[in-house]
Amino acid sequence: MTAEGSYPHVARWVRDCGWIEIGHDDYSLSMVRALDIGGLIWEGKSRYATLEAALQDLDQALAKWFKAELRD
């Protein structure tokens, strides 16, 4: 399966809305984040058991964001 098939909301986000960041840095405690030109939209937990779990959490969060913000 493709990344777009596994994480359709992440794919839509990076195609149409903004970008994601994965990993730790000096500015955030979260492992995965979604951002747009206005800044941080969502940030996940500080740790996930797997990268798959982090991407699933991100995809679910973006699905909720699309529903709330764009009425999808």
Where do the protein language model's features map onto the residues?
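Short N-terminal "domain-start" leader segments
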Residues: 1-29
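Short aromatic-glycine-(Arg/Gly/Cys) micro-motifs in beta-strand/loop hairpins
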Residues: 18-43, 61
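Mixed-charge, Lys/Arg-enriched low-complexity segments
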Residues: 1-2, 36-72
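Short, intrinsically disordered low-complexity segments
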Residues: 11-14, 32, 46, 70
